[in-house]
Curated annotation (Swiss-Prot):
Patterns the embryo by interrupting bone morphogenetic proteins (BMP) signaling. Binds BMP-4 and BMP-2 with high affinity. Can abolish BMP-4 activity by blocking binding to cognate cell-surface receptors. Capable of inducing dorsal development in embryos. Causes dorsal mesodermal differentiation of animal cap ectoderm when coexpressed with xWNT-8 and nuclear, sequence-specific DNA-binding protein xBRA. None of these molecules causes dorsal mesoderm formation when expressed alone. Coiled coil: none annotated. Keywords: Chondrogenesis, Developmental protein, Differentiation, Disulfide bond, Glycoprotein, Secreted, Signal. It is found in: Secreted. This is Noggin. Homodimer. Glycans are attached at N61. It comes from Xenopus laevis. Gene3D superfamilies: Cystine-knot cytokines, Helix hairpin bin.
Length: 222
């Protein structure tokens, strides 16, 4: 470890201690990443297992279905066949690490505004801009909560069948000091089609548009 890396590690430990405050609960984590004001539960769709409620081949005409979508088809989040780049649950940890190495978006104000000093209390002075930047980037990478997108198969009763959904990786702590985890903070809605049957006898079925929620932002939270 070179001298610069050693200093970053030492000052990071000093930041750990300096950010602690004597409050209950998890309030002492809020200096690095404030918790969102509310949770964002996304409920799984529950479908009747009886195949009698499935659309028939004639109901899956792609030209007609695209017309019913009225311009809402988003190829970045929707697909009619399973994309090759689909990730499994076991890949999310690796993806989380990869995205945190280069955090996207604007650096959080609470990190950008941090000042770092060295020396005794009576003779302390600010760190160089280069070292200060390294510390800020390190803190940002530790507290960054990227949205991890994977393709989800909704089944034949939805069109497009495959939708890209977001999740927040919660198997690591995202706060300094540790204690908080990444949780959903915001969502967006995709307009897709759902096959709905209103009666079992003399079935009356049709495609209807629905709003499908997808996590769009993750934040550090208690």
């Amino acid at each position: 470890m070179d001298h610069s890396q050693c200093l970053v590690t030492i000052y990071a430990l000093m930041v750990f201690l300096g950010l602690r405050i004597d409050q209950g609960g998890c309030q002492h984590y809020l200096h690095i990443r404030p918790a969102p004001s509310e949770n964002l539960p996304l409920v799984d769709l529950i479908e009747h297992p009886d195949p009698i409620y499935d659309p028939k081949e004639k109901d899956l005409n792609e030209t007609l279905l695209r017309t019913l979508m009225v311009g809402h088809f988003d190829p970045n989040f929707m697909a009619t066949i399973l994309p090759e780049e689909r990730l499994g649950v076991e890949d999310l940890g690796e993806l989380d690490l990869l995205l945190r190495q280069k955090p996207s978006g604007a650096m959080p104000a609470e990190i950008k505004g941090l000042e770092f000093y060295e020396g005794l209390q009576s003779k302390k002075h600010r760190l160089s801009k280069k070292l200060r930047r390294k510390l800020q980037m390190w803190l940002w990478s530790q507290t960054f909560c990227p949205v991890l997108y994977t393709w989800n198969d909704l089944g034949t009763r939805f069109w497009p069948r495959y939708v890209k959904v977001g999740s927040c990786y919660s198997k690591r702590s995202c706060s300094v000091p540790e204690g908080m985890v990444c949780k959903a903070a915001k969502s967006m809605h995709l307009t897709i089609l759902r096959w709905r049957c209103q009666r079992r006898v003399q079935q009356k079925c049709a495609w209807i548009t629905i709003q499908y929620p997808v996590i769009s932002e993750c934040k550090c939270s208690c």
